Design a protein with these regions (language model features):
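RNase H-like nuclease fold core
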Residues: 199, 259-301
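Mobile genetic element proteins and their domesticated derivatives, centered on retroelements
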Residues: 13, 29, 53, 65, ...
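Cytochrome P450 core scaffold surrounding the K-helix E-X-X-R motif
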Residues: 18-23, 27, 267-271, 288-291, ...
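RNase H-like nuclease module associated with reverse transcription
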Residues: 133, 220, 253-255, 273, ...
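Metal/cofactor- and membrane transport-associated sequence elements
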Residues: 1-124
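Retroelement integrase C-terminal DNA-binding domain
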Residues: 110, 121, 156-175, 399-417
C-alpha cells in the first residue's frame, strides 16, 4: 500500500510497553528478592500498574494504547483492531501496532512528526526513523517501489542447522516424491521440528514459494523418517540458492486480485485434499496460504469448491481492511478471484443446487454465492498454467515455480528493477 500510494514509512518502539497498562482488578504479589522490607516480610505488594508475566498484561496494554489514540481522533480499522488511521485536510496517517513495534505510514513528514511527538509524550518511545527491519523483515525502498526480504533470517537458519554451505536445489519440493507416514522410530524429531518451526515464519512472511513444501512436511513432525528428512533438506538447499529473494511491490496495479486452487487426494496415506490461495496487490503477493482441507471431499470439484470457500473468507477480510482505510480509492471494486475449475464456476453462477451434494458442500457453495451476490468477489476462469495458486497445492517444476514467483513479485534483490 505504501508503494501504491506513495506513503512514507517510519518505525517506533515502545519501551516496557506492558508496564503501561492500567489494571482493572486488585492484584497482589510477593515482595521481590532483594527488596523485602525488614520486619514486614509477611506482607505483599499491591500492583498499581500492569506487570510483565501477568496474563492480562497484553490486553491491558492494548486497551491503554487504544484509548490514547482514539482520544486524538484516530479511528480503529474494523477488520484489524491493531490498525489505526486519521485523515483530514488532504493529509493522512496510518498506524500499525504489533505488541510494542509500531509502523507509521504518512502522506508527508509533517503528519509523521506529529504522531511521533504525541506518542513520545504518552509513552516511553524509541524513534527508529525510516523503517528498516521489523519482525525480522527488512524493508528496502527506492524509486521502483518497496521490497520485503529476509535474507538475513534465511542465512541465520541455514547457519544454525548446518546448511549454509550446502548445494542448491532448483525447487523446494520434488514432485516425483510421495511421502508416507513413518512406521519406524522417529529420526531426530526435535531437530526436524525446530527446522520446520523456523521455516513456518519465513513461509508466511516473505517466501510464498516454500509454503507448500513447509506445509506438507509439517504434517510429519510427530514422527519424521529418513525420507521426510531428505525432503526437508531439499527445502534448505533451495533456500541456499535463493537466499537473496524478496517480494518487490512496484505499486501497480493497486487492485486486489486472488487465485484459488486445490489438489484432490494426492497422498496415499491422507485422503484429504490440499487447498491453496494467493492474493496480489501493488505488484506483489500480500496474502497466501497452503493447507490441508479439514473435510473429506468426493471429487475434484468439491475439493476446488472447498478451496474457493477458504479463499473467499480471506477476500472478504482483505476488502474490509481496504475499505476502512482513507487512502484507498472508493468504492473498492469486487475482488477478482481466479479459479481453474469451470465446473465450480458454473455451480457458483447457477442458483440451483444439486440434490446429491453433501451438506458441507452446499454450505460452502452458499457462502461463495452470498459474497458474489453482495459484490465482494467475482469468480472467473483462469488456465491452470497461469493460476498463481497452483504452486501452493503440489510440487512443480522449476520453470513453473520461477514463473509463478515472478508474478508474485518474488525475485532476487540484486536484480530488482
Amino acid at each position: 500500500m505504501a508503494a501504491s500510494y506513495g506513503l512514507i514509512v517510519h518505525q517506533m518502539d515502545v519501551k516496557t510497553s506492558f508496564l503501561s497498562g492500567e489494571l482493572e482488578d486488585e492484584i497482589y504479589m510477593d515482595q521481590p528478592d532483594g527488596f523485602v522490607v525488614k520486619g514486614e516480610e509477611r506482607k505483599v505488594c499491591k500492583l498499581l500498574k500492569s506487570l510483565y508475566g501477568l496474563k492480562q498484561a497484553p490486553k491491558q496494554w492494548h486497551e491503554k494504547f487504544d484509548r490514547t489514540l482514539t482520544s486524538v481522533g484516530f479511528v480503529v480499522n474494523e477488520a484489524d483492531k491493531c490498525v489505526y488511521y486519521r485523515h483530514g485536510g488532504g493529509e493522512g496517517v496510518i498506524l500499525c501496532l504489533y505488541v510494542d513495534d509500531i509502523l507509521i505510514f504518512g502522506t508527508n513528514m509533517k503528519v509523521i512528526h506529529e504522531v511521533k511527538s504525541f506518542l513520545s509524550k504518552c509513552f516511553d518511545m524509541k524513534d527508529l526513523g525510516e523503517a528498516d527491519v521489523i519482525l525480522n523483515i527488512k524493508l528496502n525502498k527506492n524509486e521502483s517501489g518497496i521490497t520485503l526480504s529476509q535474507s538475513h533470517y534465511v542465512e541465520k537458519i541455514l547457519s544454525r542447522f548446518g546448511f549454509i554451505d550446502g548445494k542448491s536445489s532448483p525447487t523446494p519440493y520434488d514432485p516425483s516424491v510421495i511421502l508416507r507416514k513413518n512406521k519406524n522410530e522417529p529420526t531426530d524429531q526435535l531437530r526436524y521440528s525446530q527446522i520446520i518451526g523456523s521455516l513456518m515464519y519465513l513461509a508466511s512472511a516473505t517466501r510464498p514459494d516454500i509454503s507448500f513444501a513447509v506445509s506438507k512436511l509439517s504434517r510429519f513432525m510427530s514422527n519424521p523418517g529418513i525420507y521426510h528428512w531428505h525432503a526437508l533438506e531439499r527445502v534448505m538447499r533451495y533456500l541456499c540458492g535463493t537466499m537473496s529473494y524478496g517480494i518487490h511491490y512496484s505499486g501497480h496495479p493497486a487492485v486486489l486480485e486472488g487465485y484459488s486452487d486445490a489438489n484432490w487426494i494426492s497422498d496415499v496415506d491422507d485422503i484429504k485434499a490440499t487447498s491453496g490461495y494467493v492474493f496480489t496487490f501493488g505488484g506483489g503477493a500480500v496474502s497466501w496460504r497452503s493447507c490441508r482441507q479439514t473435510i473429506l471431499t468426493r471429487s475434484t470439484m468439491e475439493a476446488e469448491l472447498t478451496a474457493l470457500d477458504t479463499s473467499t473468507v480471506e477476500s472478504e477480510w482483505l476488502r474490509e481492511l481496504l475499505m476502512d482505510l482513507p487512502v484507498v480509492e472508493k468504492p473498492v471494486p469486487a475482488i477478482l478471484l481466479n479459479c481453474d475449475n469451470q465446473t465450480v464456476i458454473v455451480k457458483v453462477n447457477n442458483s440451483k443446487d444439486n440434490a446429491k451434494s453433501s451438506r458441507h458442500v452446499k454450505r460452502r457453495l452458499k457462502s461463495v454465492r452470498k459474497l458474489r451476490n453482495s459484490g465482494v468477489i467475482t469468480v472467473t476462469y483462469i488456465q491452470t498454467d497461469k493460476n498463481l495458486a497452483d504452486p501452493f497445492t503440489k510440487g512443480l517444476s522449476s520453470n513453473v515455480i520461477d514463473s509463478a514467483s515472478r508474478e508474485m513479485g518474488l525475485r532476487p534483490i540484486d536484480v530488482m528493477p
